[in-house]
Amino acid sequence: MHLPAALTGALTLIARAPALWPGFAPQRTPLLTFDGTRTWLNHADPGEDGWTHVDGAWVWPGRHPSLSAHTAVTLPGGLGAAGVLLPDLSLPGDPDQAARTLAATLIHEAFHVYQGATPSPAWPAPELAALTYPAGAEVRHARAEETHWLRVALRAGAGDWTTPARHALHWRARRHAQLDAAHRTFETRMETTEGLALYVETRFLADHPDLDPDAAPLQTPRGWSYRSGAALAHLLDRTGTPWTGEVLAGHPLADLLTGQVGSPLPAAPHPDLEGAAQAAADAHDADLGARLAAFHAQPGPALHLSSPGGLRLGGFDPMNLHAVGPGTFLHARHVQVRGPDAELLTVGHSVLTRGPDLFSVQEVTLRGLPAPTAHGGRWQIRTPTLTVDLPGDAVQVTPDGWSVRLG
């Protein structure tokens, strides 16, 4: 039993890596790697039973339960480690390039371990704000323009990079004017959380982040913030200022860059990017429209539940949640809602909720329902995908099913 060749090469490269961020030492960060057969732990003692010591590393048979994605993980003994799943990595066929790719990925996740051990206002991001992040053509177009100018600035080398950087800041300001405070905070914090992890990864690779203006209109705000944050950090490096401490103090990367290169400088739009943004926004709207139409087209009776005083959102699946209109959300897989003497739980049955915001639910609609049962004054539906429990005297029969109004 020996370390996979790519991991052996990656550990050698990590040991030789230059300083990438003050106080960050991937050479001493515990690294957890699943090779498809067993899990390897390097740079630390696991602090739990079940591991075997082999060739200077620790081995767990199969995939360790703590490791389910490329991410920072915590082992049962409390050890924080950078986790990587080799089967999920598309490693190059060349052994040297495979080792380099794996090393860069481990360094990225190791930076998240560093972040977890380094308290800073730069890290927490209100990720739920991504669920309601504006998806219109103006926001998408400005993102594409900013991506274009960030790429020009990075490619300028020793030439004039500050002018395109200021153009990028102009389009950022245009975009941020369309966002509310929560959306702006989400973006700037994702840039310091995920963007800086990509920054240290690309510094290790002596490369820049992949910036594609044509793809930018289609990218999610979260996915784009990896690239924008890394790009801003690389540009800050060119200023020669000790900017990393300012980031740890909570200052957004773009604000720091503005302080170094000057105020945003207007730049004319690119018609092709404007058209691509409109097409992306139209496709997004069409997708939401199709999802909503499919929801309403479900055969069978419907239940309309309302409560002027509000219902409590107990849980939901953010990966299967769609904002289909102002204050209107389609929960495509799972949601739990509670109200006065009432409960609704779905796991595989879609639900439409309405209210002032995601968590302030005032109306709930379900369609495609089976026949309910009535017992002991309760009106109930119980299936493998759906639980509805309501006071029977509050349920009214309607032409399309039932309605309930709770106090």
Task: Name each model feature, range by range.
Residues 49-100:
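Active-site scaffold of zinc-dependent metalloenzymes
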Residues 12-13, 241-407:
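Non-catalytic terminal regions of proteins
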Residues 104-117:
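Active-site recognition of the HExxH zinc-binding catalytic motif
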Residues 2-5, 223, 283, 287:
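Alpha-helix boundary/N-cap detector
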Residues 1-61, 104, 331-333, 337-340:
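N-terminal mature-domain "stem" immediately C-terminal to a signal peptide or N-terminal signal-anchor/transmembrane
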Residues 181-274:
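Active-site-proximal alpha-helical
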Residues 96, 104, 127-128:
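Sequence context surrounding c-type heme c attachment/ligation sites in exported
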Residues 117-179, 183-211, 229:
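Post-HExxH zinc-binding segment in Zn-dependent metallohydrolases
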